[in-house]
UniProtKB/Swiss-Prot annotation:
Keyword Cell division: yes
Residue ranges that the Swiss-Prot or TrEMBL entry lists as coiled coil: 90-123
Predominant subcellular localization, coarse grouping: cytoplasm
Name of the encoding gene: PAC1
A cellular component term, taken from the record's GO annotations: cytoplasm
Subunit structure: Self-associates. Interacts with NDL1 and dynein.
Name of the protein in question: Nuclear distribution protein PAC1
Gene3D superfamilies according to UniProt: 1.20.960.30, YVTN repeat-like/Quinoprotein amine dehydrogenase
Locations listed in the record: Cytoplasm, Cytoskeleton; Cytoplasm, Cytoskeleton, Spindle pole
The organism's place on the tree of life at top rank: Eukaryota
């Protein structure tokens, strides 16, 4: 046996069948391209193929069969195996593609099984301390699995998503100005839908009121901001599953970029920011504008509120802290290279000294109620800042600290490949989404990226939401929802 026969991974029978298939394909190919236009050339080619068959086909019966099947005098004879080789080739390509898909699906399923096994192990170690029988500490350690539990489709790109604080309902706002409510256990048809604005909704926030006055009934409030320069306030009527508009807030002179609603005692306020460079504070009960101030020289893109303080991020690449009742600007953060898309306070949580940034470092910060904030930017980074303490005086509004009025960047997260659109903090994890079509989970303690979801959306990921971990009125659940330019919203549940 020669060396080439030893290297060929075929038996003699398989080699013979392959040779016949090659010869038949060559014969068919030249019949199509040469025979009718250049008969003389075809005869010479056919003669060469017949000669080649003498070398390749070992059995005389096979050679005679090949020659007779390619006899030009018999026009009616058709060799059904002439295209056997290209058919097999095409089948192999399809099979290889199918194998790759099956391997990917298998890998995903194996990952899900590992996640479920981990969850079972964690559940076996849980010490129930909450009303739903789940350890609050372990709830905050939850990282969503690779694939969503359900997928919600709407008519246009999703611009904002919010989870109901207590019920399995997600609110979805779109670029066409529509507002939806979906039941997470039956999401094929929305519970309610409303054309709330004439242009795109840019931001949405929700609050379940907690009035101590028995004469006021508690309910969920949904607030939306839009490119139509308006802010709309809705009451979610759970019994009828519908949005009931309470009022509209008018006053901004350009696109309203973001909106926040919060409650302090029995007072409910709404904050909004706009491309008109202003931030406004509204009274929820009567719709009056209580305060207007201009913290930035360009478009104010994002705000967050904690008590009497507002943090704002702007197109001018800075973020600023303002005491909203007085309008006093207290401190500024510089370090981003491009506009800031999102800002948030990092709230303190009790009994978690092991989590970085969630516990005050000094008693002064503890008494003040805040110390850190986070910002996401178009420069593809996320930064955590330490906020300098202002000068606090009894019975007076705080003023800037004359010796320290600049934020200090203490940690930078790098990994996204495009604009970072939204962020959310839960326990020791920071979740972010970006225009690179990915969602990432970061560890606050180490700054490392722990997990990446790369194929949730086919376009930009515009927004995400998780249950907050600092509000006792919010049921501690393990849920995350994302919204994207592809008109889809992914929901993760444990």
């Amino acid at each position: 046996m020669t060396n080439w026969q030893q290297q060929l991974p075929l038996t003699d029978t398989q080699k013979n069948e392959l040779d016949k298939s090659v010869l038949r394909y060559l014969n068919w190919n030249y019949k199509q391209t040469v025979r009718h236009e250049h008969a003389q050339d075809y005869e010479s080619v056919r003669h060469a193929i017949v000669t080649l068959s003498g070398f390749l086909l070992q059995e005389s019966v096979d050679r005679q069969e090949f020659i007779s099947n390619n006899d030009t005098s018999n026009e009616s004879m058709v060799d059904i195996d002439e295209l056997l080789l290209p058919k097999k080739w095409n089948s192999i390509v399809r099979l290889q593609k199918k194998i790759i898909e099956l391997e990917q699906n298998t890998e995903t399923l194996v990952s899900q099984i590992k996640d479920l096994n981990t969850q079972v192990s964690e559940l076996a170690q849980f010490k129930p301390t909450t009303s739903n029988g789940t350890s609050a500490h372990n709830v905050l350690k939850w990282i969503p699995r690779n694939l969503p539990s359900c997928l919600i489709n709407v008519e246009s790109s999703v611009t904002s998503v919010k989870l109901h604080p207590n019920l399995p309902i997600v609110f979805v706002a779109t670029d066409h100005g529509k507002l939806y409510a979906f039941d997470l256990f039956n999401y094929t048809i929305p519970l309610a839908s409303l054309q709330s604005h004439t242009k795109a909704i840019t931001s949405m926030d929700v609050l379940f009121t907690n009035f101590t006055n028995s004469s006021k009934k508690n309910y969920l409030v949904v607030v939306t901001a839009s490119k139509d320069l308006q802010i709309h306030v809705f009451k979610w009527v759970s019994e009828e599953c519908k949005f009931q508009q309470i009022r509209s807030l008018l006053g901004h002179e350009h696109i309203v970029s973001a909106v926040k609603i919060w409650q302090k005692n029995n007072d409910v306020h709404i904050a909004s920011c706009s491309r008109d460079q202003t931030v406004k504070i509204w009274d929820f009960h009567n719709g009056w504008s209580l305060k207007t101030f201009q913290p930035h020289s360009q478009w104010v893109r994002s705000i967050d509120v904690l008590g009497d303080y507002i943090i704002s991020g702007s197109h001018d690449t800075t973020l600023r802290l303002t005491h909203w009742p007085s309008g006093n600007g207290l401190s500024v953060g510089t370090g981003h290279e491009f506009p800031i898309e999102k800002v948030k306070f990092i709230h303190f949580i009790e009994d978690s000294p092991e989590i970085r940034f969630r516990t005050p470092s000094t008693d002064r910060y503890k008494n003040w109620g805040m110390q850190y904030c986070v910002s996401a930017s178009r420069d593809r980074t996320i930064k955590i800042w330490e906020i300098p303490l202002p000068t606090l005086m009894a019975h007076r509004a705080p003023i800037p600290n004359p010796t320290d009025s600049n934020f200090r960047c203490v940690l930078t997260f790098k990994g996204h490949l495009s604009w970072v659109r939204d962020i959310s903090i839960r326990g020791q994890y920071l979740f972010s989404c970006a225009d690179d079509k990915s969602v990432r989970c970061w560890d606050l303690n180490t700054g490392q990226c722990l997990h990446v979801w790369e194929k949730l959306h086919t376009g930009f990921v515009n927004c995400l939401d998780l249950d907050v971990d600092f509000d006792s009125n919010v049921t501690p659940r393990q849920m995350m929802v994302t919204g994207g330019l592809d008109c889809k919203s992914n929901v993760f549940m444990r």
